[in-house]
Amino acid sequence: MKRIIFYLAGMLFTVSCFADGTAPVEPWYRNGFQSGVGVSVTGGLNIFAGYHNPELSSPWLRYFGARIGLATTDPLKSAIDSMIERYMQDGRDVGDGVKIDEGKLDAWHGNVLVDYYPFRGSWRLTGGYVWGAMSLDSKIFGSIDEAPAQRFYFYLAGDHYYYNGNNFSGSAKIDWKYYGPYLGSGFDFDIFCGFSFFIDAGVVFTNRPARMVLEIPHEQLYIYNKETSSWGPVTIAALDRDVAAAEHDANRKLSDWRLYPMVKLGFAYRF
């Protein structure tokens, strides 16, 4: 019985795909509504709904389409984190023996887009509005593998520190809550029976840059006192002051970057 049902369903699908021109004339709005699903490293899983009909009688509307979409990394979190972990394998050196490791990405965004097909083909230009957030958590660490008995020295905001041991660990977090206009381009490649493959690539001109927060544990941490030319346990106030200075310097550099990139690949179906 199941084989018969699947066989009849396949026949119905084939007939609906390859029916000849004797079918009744469809209303003007048919064959334009579409929905799709895609993936992106900076957005995760994306779903959208929209409309584009290049056969409209209007000499202007036939060149345009519209889409609204939502995206989140939650369904693909393990895959994205594994990709980041492979990229940061053994850590990424940022100087003074300090490395970044174990990145964890959380992101989401919504968008309202207008597509322009200048040649009524597969290529389109896209503009619109995007809002969302991105959070990247990472571990920072340092060690001296060749000399396990030595102290680990490093500089922070101009002050000289060391941990009472040959390693240290901390964390860095980047938060980016944004909104702004989107500009990009893309392609829609028809496959068969209303199915298509799409590519989107563009940037969001964000209203604000990302912000970094740095956390360094103070236990077993010593600072060099320039006035007495001696080492001593760091006070929480002194460490917080240097951490704030380091964050300010990092955020000043981040303020020069306000473009949030987006590249998406996926499939769509036009009704």
Per-region residue spans from a language model:
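Positively charged n-region of N-terminal signal peptides that target proteins for export
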Residues: M1-I4
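Secretome/extracellular-domain signature
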Residues: W108, D115-R120, T126-A133, K139
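Short loop/turn motifs that connect adjacent beta-strands in outer-membrane beta-barrel proteins
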Residues: D20-G32, E55-F64, F119-S122, D190-F197
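A contiguous pocket-lining binding segment that forms or flanks enzyme active sites
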Residues: S169, W176-C193
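Transmembrane beta-strands of outer-membrane beta-barrel proteins
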Residues: N31-V37, I47, R62-I68, V112, ...
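Transmembrane beta-strands of outer-membrane beta-barrel pores
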Residues: V39-G43, N53, L70-L76, P118, ...
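Extracellular/periplasm-exposed beta-strand and loop segments of Gram-negative cell-envelope proteins
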Residues: A23-P27, G36-G38, T72-G110, A133-Y179, ...
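N-terminal signal peptide c-region/cleavage motif recognized by signal peptidases
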Residues: T14-S16
